[in-house]
Regions:
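Positively charged n-region of N-terminal signal peptides that target proteins for export
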Residues: 1-4
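Hydrophobic h-region of N-terminal signal peptides that target proteins for export
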Residues: 10-18
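Metal-dependent phosphoester-hydrolase catalytic domains
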Residues: 206-217, 224-319
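N-terminal, active-site-proximal structural segment of metallo-dependent hydrolase catalytic domains
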Residues: 19-100, 105-107, 115-120, 177, ...
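Active-site beta-strand/loop signature of hydrolases that rely on acidic residues for catalysis
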Residues: 30-35, 64-90, 126, 166, ...
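Structured beta-strand-rich core segments of catalytic domains in phosphoester-bond hydrolases
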Residues: 81-176, 292-293
Length: 319
């Protein structure tokens, strides 16, 4: 009798353990958002009389903070981070503005990308601490010298771009996930550099991840649409595929969504069909939904604007 009871107890424990193990499928929401550096805002406003002064960072910071909160991602990659956006200078850091508004659920990962320890078109990752636990994180550079902010002598022009990564553990299932936030050089500066960034991004990502059985996501502003060097290198790896095109090819996107680009003009007067922003996943994850978020938010004078010259993108993934 005791043996039977013991066997029953062991069976119950085994079932409970199985339910808590990585076999359980859950849905996570991930995103990517290029915030448009404060320097870039100043430069473009000075050159463009039609560009509203409400797009200065000091006027748009609260809109960015509200939008990032509303996206409600479990993990999000951020691009074009500078000192004022991060809150190292001034009082308009979007993280503090989010916390002041009551959103304290995110932890943030950033490493200075400048050779002097400054933030210059840097990249970051935010994740909900109730959903994930950070195990490891770091930064590497995409100009051929991975461990410092330098470029190979043969590296194409402008290719000294960063990628921040995190090894995260899902709190409910215990599953491990690698997440990368990257920003490639604009092809207008160097097509070769755009491809070089992509090649270095995936080469080092593969080294970090190791086993192909470990789920991984690369997001960011690739400055490349489908058919351009940076995109084609990532897609051509055979390991990471763009969620937008996965769902589009399967007929799972609304027609209106298939026509959306991820950028707006600097003056907000026209919306581009260009798609430089991407969420790419490996075969360990399943794409369930994708959206380019084109919402306007009130700035300091109460008028509504697109908070950045990029639109955030979000995807739901089965993990």
């Amino acid at each position: 009798m005791r043996r039977i009871v013991l066997l029953l107890l062991l069976s119950v424990v085994a079932i409970m353990a199985a339910e808590a193990k990585p076999n359980k499928k859950v849905t996570i929401k991930v995103g990517s958002y290029n915030l448009m550096t404060s320097d870039s805002r100043v430069k473009h406003i000075a050159k463009n009389a039609d560009m509203s002064h409400q797009r200065y960072w000091c006027h748009s910071a609260q809109a960015i903070a509200a939008q990032v909160s509303d996206l409600d991602c479990d993990i999000i990659g951020i691009q074009e981070v500078c000192d004022s956006i991060w809150g190292l200078t001034g009082d308009k850091g979007f993280r503090k503005l989010m916390e002041d508004a009551g959103n304290t659920q995110y932890k943030w990962i950033l490493y200075p990308n400048g050779s002097k320890g400054n933030l210059s078109y840097d990249v970051a990752i935010g994740y909900k601490s109730e959903v994930f636990t950070e195990l490891e994180s770091g930064i590497y550079w995409l100009a051929g010298i991975f461990d410092r902010s330098e470029a190979l002598p043969t590296a194409p022009k402008g290719s000294k771009r960063p990628c921040v990564w995190a090894k995260l553990q899902h709190n409910e299932t215990g599953k491990i996930l690698y997440f990368f936030s990257a920003h490639f050089v604009v092809p207008g500066i160097s097509k070769e550099g755009n491809a070089f960034n992509a090649e270095n991004c995936i080469t080092y990502a593969e080294k970090l991840i190791g086993s192909r059985k470990v789920p991984s996501i690369i997001v960011g502003d690739f400055n490349a649409a489908k058919g351009a060097p940076g995109f084609d290198v990532v897609e051509g790896s055979g390991r990471w595929h763009d969620v937008f095109y996965i769902l589009k090819d399967e007929g799972m996107l609304d027609e209106s969504e298939t026509k959306k680009g991820t950028c707006n003009a600097k003056n907000e007067q026209s919306i581009s069909g260009w798609r430089p922003d991407h969420i790419t996943i490996d075969g360990n994850l399943t794409a369930e939904s994708f959206k380019t978020v084109r919402d306007k938010y009130p700035t300091t004078d109460g008028t509504e604007h697109y908070p950045s010259d990029h639109f955030p993108i979000v995807a739901e993934l089965k993990f």
